[in-house]
Design a protein with these regions (language model features):
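Macrodomain-like recognition of ADP-ribose-binding/processing modules
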Residues: 1-166
Length: 166
């Protein structure tokens, strides 16, 4: 299956789960970039729910290839700040950073941004990690039984990110 076929397979699965978006989806052009934006949009609006293993395998293959195309930045190779051993400052796409953990500026529900293709860091992280991140966050919040207080954090898997944890 080539890239456009992977994207279209994932779109079809998501549209079966969320048929309310079928008419809007038909308006998207068939080129790869437009179909990628449609896929990301559907992933952004998908509420947490069980994930089909065949969908996850296809999603993970696509997101892994995307990660490799963007390139990975090794956190342990970044230059340290003069006079501050062990501290490095890096500015760039956080979804490329291979580190033990990255920090997401999420909301108190920890479910990620639901605005399709929004430019916020929360959307970028959830989009690059895959739907497993929203699913894990949903389970954590359900167990907690209340919104996450400001300044607090939860640790989740990084899934398709180069970082091990978010």
């Amino acid at each position: 299956m080539n890239r456009i076929q992977q994207i279209q397979y994932l779109i079809q699965v998501l549209l079966q789960e969320m048929p309310a978006y079928q008419e809007q989806a038909r308006a998207f052009p068939q080129d790869e970039l437009s179909q990628w934006r449609l896929l990301r949009s559907l992933m952004n609006v998908r509420p947490p729910m069980p994930l089909d293993p065949s969908f996850l395998a296809a999603q993970d293959a696509l997101l892994s290839a995307e990660r490799e195309e963007k390139g990975v930045v090794e956190a342990d190779t970044l230059p340290e700040r003069p006079g501050h051993p062990g501290i490095a400052v890096w500015q760039g796409d956080i979804t490329r950073l291979k580190a033990d953990a990255i920090v997401d500026a999420d909301n108190d529900r920890l479910l990620g941004c639901f605005v399709p293709c929004h430019g916020c860091i929360d959307n970028a992280i959830h989009s690059a990690a895959g739907l497993q991140l929203r699913d894990e966050c949903s389970r954590l919040m359900e167990q907690q039984g209340r919104p996450e207080p400001t300044g607090q954090a939860k640790l989740t898997g990084g899934y398709n990110l180069p970082a091990r944890y978010v």
